[in-house]
Each structure stands twice: as structure tokens, then as C-alpha cells.
Amino acid sequence: YGVEVVVRILSAHRTPKELVSFIESIDGEVDVIIAAAGKAAHLPGVIAASTLIPVVGLPIKSSTMDGMDSLLSMVQMPKGIPVATVTIDSGLNAALMAMQIMSIKYPKLKEDLKTYRQEMAQKVLDDDKSINQEL
């Protein structure tokens, strides 16, 4: 879809200074941040507390709780520090959510997302037709 991305590996616990420095350096340069984290999963919340850039939290399955610990850490944010959170290990939905947020600013992206949804709907209809022909 032509969306420019920056990928970093940083930790809210192990590299907090570098994380905050990076967030400060991209202020005004990016439209949305996707923050993937497992276990305690404080990364999206720390980022959201450090910037007004929208943050999409992506919980990762990485512990004995199958990612539920990560998910709950992200959705239980305190009032005033929101993190838009998708389902566990759902990188595609995180990207689509980020694109939807960006589509407010970029009309071409909105059209691309409409086309994507139309293609998904058509696939369901094609699958329905195909299975009924097999019966």
C-alpha cells in the first residue's frame, strides 16, 4: 500500500531511555505507532504516555498465559492514556488499524482500504458459491 515504515526493537523495561529518546525524535514525523509486546507488555502504554501520536498495541503470545497477560496489560490503560489494542498476534489487524487512522490524512489509503474490504467480501461470496456447487 506504499506506507512507509520504521522498525525498531526497544524495551520499556530494558532500554527506557532509548525508547523515550526515539519517541521524542519521531514526534511530528510519523502518523501512528504500532507497539508489539509480550508478557507484562508495558511498551505501548509507555509510548502512549510519552506522545500524542496514536498508538496501536499488538499483544504477543510469549508466556504461559498464551498472550492474555499482554492483552490485558494493553487494554487496561488508565484514563487519559489510550492505546488502541488488537487481538493477540494479530499483526495484520494492527497494520490495518494504523492504515485506517492514517486514511484520515491520506485519501488514497482510504480508497485502498475500501478495495481491500471489497476483495475480502468477494472472496467470501466466491467461497460460498464454490461450496454450494460441490454439494
What are these model-predicted stretches?
Residues 15-17, 37-46, 65-68, 91-95:
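Short glycine/serine/threonine-rich phosphate/pyrophosphate-binding segments
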Residues 1, 28-29, 81:
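Structured helix-beta-strand junction loops
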Residues 1-14:
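Glycine-rich phosphate/diphosphate-binding loop of Rossmann-like nucleotide-binding domains
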Residues 9, 58-61, 84-87:
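Short beta->alpha connector loops at strand-helix junctions that form conserved
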